[in-house]
């Protein structure tokens, strides 16, 4: 063969092949689904390119995929007359994985085969799945519009290398031949192959045909029998489509091995005409947080495939949604640039966003357990919503879930509607605290009075929470209030102070002034508080002051952070505060005040500028 060369696989491909053969073997029949799915994609791409260049059809516009096998040679062949590939494309698509972050992801995978098989499925392993059942795979392909002599041959045993060469191929498209391993004879059985295709590929809009051989007059006559419905699933009536068909179609378009959590299939007529089929996955893709992660919907215009990953139809905080939209209002020659500035696109985006939020609301209402699965996988992404989509903020807020003092669990199961339904008589605000961890939030001294009064506090410990709460200012007419900020509504919750206590506090005014003088501009203010029950002192910030958690976010992002000026609040009923107030020796007084401030700062920030000084001071006071 001309131009023959042997090349090594990209290292990630070798790792993926090894993991896949071992992890997916228990579900090995999916290789046929994957290869037929790829053939369908190749047909979609040809249809799209032929819109502007009909000559690409080369006189054969009836697109199909054909499956045949040879029992003597023990081969199974899947052939399509789709867009095909040239030599460079063969090397790019069959020798490398073009996903950033793949290497580190593969290295992190463990020995949990069930989990591994789900994660591997997210790569859209497609072609490589052939090696689950084959010890050698041969590919013959030619790109649509190329000369017959520009065909390409590719072959590999799925180990370290592959061979590529030039061949003559008269018909366009791709033909993949699997040389089956010993023990895989089931895939040479006509009935078995038919049943797999019916199970996994009935929804494919492309006709899938299987070879029929009949003996007539001593000769073998070959014909092709269509064995799938070959009608685009989303164009069919919802009442005719089974759940299994929706599930398999999801796996086809999302290249996922797991069933989706839920879906919504809608046909809209009137001002705008479109069909949408939207899915919520049951598992986050491994690269969801990767900057290069591709997301978006498949776009069809009048049932003609236009593009994958059309992100213009979904806001970023819903980037986990998979599915498609088939519009009658967009032009067939639409580009990503046209989509960006199109009124039709904006209207579709608005309608589809509402549809997804309604779908999630229904899931939360009908199946709390499934919704918890969704929340664990995608809750952090949904939390971007309040900042990104003010118009739908109330709908997004209903979908948020939090840990809370009511449940006494780190599980984020409490909705804002739950919280409001449990608010105490006269309670006007929704109280929350942000912290680095659930434990830090739960044990914060800021909660002491609220706990005593039985008032629920939402415990927020995800990094995004502080940023989200800057935009989420109210729900159901109730304002959100951080308990780490100075607020009169919290002070009002304290028990009425009797006259004797008032006199005692009045007597402490010189003490407060003495502390102010000592600390100077290191704090914004010093005051007595009734919001503490067990703790001697805390620090809080004013409503307009940057919070501790926000300062940490800025610092983690490498941005300059203005110094947070705290209000130093002292518990007049605490023995340590009383002892400090009674201390006459100035040096000793200073040590006590510094210790109380350091304790408060440590509880608030989790760190101290000089922890050794704090330890020295504490040890000294313990023995004094």
Swiss-Prot record:
UMPylated on a histidine residue by YdiU under ATP-limited conditions. Residues 337-552 are annotated as: B. It is found in: Cytoplasm. Keywords: ATP-binding, Chaperone, Cytoplasm, Nucleotide-binding, Stress response. Residues 1-336 are annotated as: A. Its main location: cytoplasm. One of its GO terms (biological process) is DNA damage response. GO terms for cellular component: cytosol. It comes from the Bacteria. GO terms for molecular function: ATP binding; ATP hydrolysis activity; ATP-dependent protein folding chaperone; unfolded protein binding. InterPro entries: HATPase_C_sf, Heat_shock_protein_90_CS, HSP90_C, Hsp90_fam, Hsp90_N, Ribosomal_Su5_D2-typ_SF. UMPylation of the chaperone by YdiU negatively regulates its activity, facilitating Salmonella survival under ATP-limited conditions. Residues 553-624 are annotated as: C. Molecular chaperone. Has ATPase activity. Homodimer. Belongs to the heat shock protein 90 family. This is Chaperone protein HtpG. It comes from Salmonella typhimurium (strain LT2 / SGSC1412 / ATCC 700720). The gene is htpG.
């Amino acid at each position: 063969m001309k131009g023959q060369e042997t090349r090594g696989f990209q290292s990630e491909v070798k790792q993926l092949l090894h993991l896949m053969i071992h992890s997916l073997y228990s579900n090995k029949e999916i290789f046929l689904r994957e290869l037929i799915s790829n053939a369908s994609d190749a047909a979609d791409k040809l249809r799209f390119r032929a819109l502007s260049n009909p000559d690409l059809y080369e006189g054969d516009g009836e697109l199909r995929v054909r499956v045949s096998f040879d029992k003597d040679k023990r081969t199974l062949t899947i052939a399509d007359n789709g867009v095909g590939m040239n030599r460079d494309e063969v090397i790019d698509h069959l020798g490398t994985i073009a996903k950033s972050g793949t290497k580190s992801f593969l290295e992190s995978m463990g020995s949990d085969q069930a989990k591994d098989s789900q994660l591997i499925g997210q790569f859209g392993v497609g072609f490589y799945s052939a090696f689950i059942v084959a010890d050698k795979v041969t590919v013959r392909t030619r790109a649509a519009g190329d000369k017959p002599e520009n065909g390409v041959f590719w072959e590999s045993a799925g180990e370290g290398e592959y061979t590529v060469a030039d061949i003559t191929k008269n018909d366009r498209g791709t033909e993949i031949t699997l040389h089956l391993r010993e023990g895989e004879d089931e895939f040479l059985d006509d009935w078995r192959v038919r049943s797999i295709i019916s199970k996994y590929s009935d929804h494919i809009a492309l006709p899938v045909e299987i070879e029929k051989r009949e003996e007539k007059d001593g000769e073998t006559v070959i014909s092709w029998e269509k064995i799938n419905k070959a009608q685009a699933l989303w164009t069919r009536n919802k009442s005719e489509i089974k759940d299994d068909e929706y599930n398999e179609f999801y796996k086809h378009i999302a290249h996922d091995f797991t069933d989706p959590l839920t879906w919504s299939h809608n046909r809209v007529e009137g001002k705008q005409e479109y069909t949408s089929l939207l899915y919520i996955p049951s598992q986050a893709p491994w690269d969801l947080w990767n900057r290069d992660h591709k997301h978006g919907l498949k776009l069809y215009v009048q049932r003609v495939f236009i593009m994958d990953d059309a992100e213009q139809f979904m806001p970023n905080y819903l980037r986990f949604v998979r599915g498609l939209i088939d519009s009658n209002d967009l032009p067939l020659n639409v580009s990503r640039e046209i989509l960006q500035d199109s009124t039709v696109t904006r209207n579709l985006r608005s309608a589809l966003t509402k549809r997804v939020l309604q779908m999630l609301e229904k899931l939360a209402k009908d199946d709390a357990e499934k919704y918890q699965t969704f929340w664990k996988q995608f809750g952090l992404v949904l939390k971007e919503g309040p900042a990104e989509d003010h118009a739908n903020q109330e709908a997004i807020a209903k979908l948020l879930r939090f840990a809370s003092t009511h449940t006494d669990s780190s599980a984020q199961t409490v909705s804002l509607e739950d919280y409001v339904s449990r608010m105490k008589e006269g309670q006007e605000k929704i109280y929350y605290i942000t912290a680095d961890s659930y434990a830090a939030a739960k044990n914060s001294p800021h909660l002491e009075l609220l706990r005593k009064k039985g008032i629920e506090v939402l415990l927020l410990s995800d990094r995004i929470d502080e940023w989200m709460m800057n935009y989420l200012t109210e729900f159901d007419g109730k304002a959100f209030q951080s308990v780490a900020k100075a607020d009169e509504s919290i002070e009002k919750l304290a028990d009425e102070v009797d006259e004797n206590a008032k006199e005692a506090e009045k007597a402490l005014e010189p003490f407060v002034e003495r502390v102010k003088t000592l600390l100077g501009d290191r704090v914004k203010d010093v005051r007595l508080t009734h919001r503490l029950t067990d703790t001697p002192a805390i620090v809080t910030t004013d409503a307009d002051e940057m919070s501790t958690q926000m300062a940490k976010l800025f610092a983690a992002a490498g941005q300059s952070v203005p110094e947070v000026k705290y209000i130093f609040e002292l518990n007049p009923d605490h023995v340590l505060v009383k002892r400090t107030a009674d201390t006459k020796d100035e040096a000793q007084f200073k040590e006590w005040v510094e210790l109380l401030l350091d304790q408060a700062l440590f509880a608030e920030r989790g760190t101290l500028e000089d922890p050794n000084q704090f330890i020295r001071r504490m040890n000294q006071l313990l023995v004094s």
